């Protein structure tokens, strides 16, 4: 198969996985900053997140990560040397609106991403930017229960409008949410929900929150298209490949 000459070969990063600097230049904590690594109880924390904001773990990978916040110029240069033509990135919501409810955005955060996207462009790398990659502002989790509350839709719209307008000439390709369906599988990871998987109201809470995210995603697309009709905006779905253990019919039935 012959690919088009403008096919976007690239790599991917996410703010909570690479930036670090979790409380610098006005940024406040987000949901990912309370998750420990796999060796210190990450899976249990995600499935039973009721006390995650108060629990103290030995190590939080997102708080330092690979220090991309301070070293992005070096990292972009190295990525360019590898020959990539596109780089998936995400914006940390709390770098722009630290609590999610400020009337005015944080200029330090806006400037950082402007410089980051400009650096990508300088090396001929197309930024593909996600608005929300598993990082709900802590303040919105505590006050509203994160995406369980419809009021997050308007706050997300404000955030989306701010970054769409600021980077209208730097970014063409956008994603509203990373793995938007993950909120139904691991609610804390996907949407900052503190609901336990054993809660009898689990399905009601989770699917209501998923609905709110879907509405917010649609609203963001509408906003973005008004700001720049040339924007290409979508979202990302989580998926996995599974195979029967063997060709035994019982395994095949179990798989389906």
Name every feature range the model reports, one short phrase each.
Residues 66-78, 153-163:
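Short, acidic/polar
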């Amino acid at each position: 198969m012959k690919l088009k000459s403008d096919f976007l070969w690239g790599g991917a990063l996410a703010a909570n996985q690479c930036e670090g600097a979790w409380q610098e230049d006005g940024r406040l904590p987000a949901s990912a900053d309370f998750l420990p690594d796999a060796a210190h109880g990450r899976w249990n924390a995600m499935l039973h997140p009721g006390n995650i904001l108060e629990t103290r773990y030995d190590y939080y990978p997102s708080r330092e990560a690979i220090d991309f916040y301070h070293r992005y110029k070096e990292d972009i240069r190295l990525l360019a040397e590898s020959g990539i033509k596109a780089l998936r990135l995400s914006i940390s919501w709390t770098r722009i609106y630290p609590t999610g409810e400020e009337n005015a955005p944080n200029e330090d955060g806006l400037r950082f991403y402007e410089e980051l996207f400009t650096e990508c462009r300088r090396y001929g790398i197309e930024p593909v930017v996600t608005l929300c990659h598993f990082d709900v502002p802590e303040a919105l989790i505590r006050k509203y229960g994160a995406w369980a509350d419809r009021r997050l839709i308007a706050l997300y719209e404000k955030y989306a409008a701010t970054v769409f307008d600021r980077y209208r000439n730097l970014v063409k390709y956008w994603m509203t949410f990373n793995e938007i369906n993950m909120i139904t599988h691991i609610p804390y990871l996907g949407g900052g929900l503190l609901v336990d998987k054993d809660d009898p109201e689990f399905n009601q809470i989770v699917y209501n929150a998923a609905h709110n995210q879907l509405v917010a995603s649609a609203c963001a697309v509408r906003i973005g298209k008004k700001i720049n009709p040339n924007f290409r905006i979508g979202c990302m779905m989580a998926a996995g490949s599974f195979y029967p253990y063997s060709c035994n019919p019982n395994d095949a039935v179990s798989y389906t």
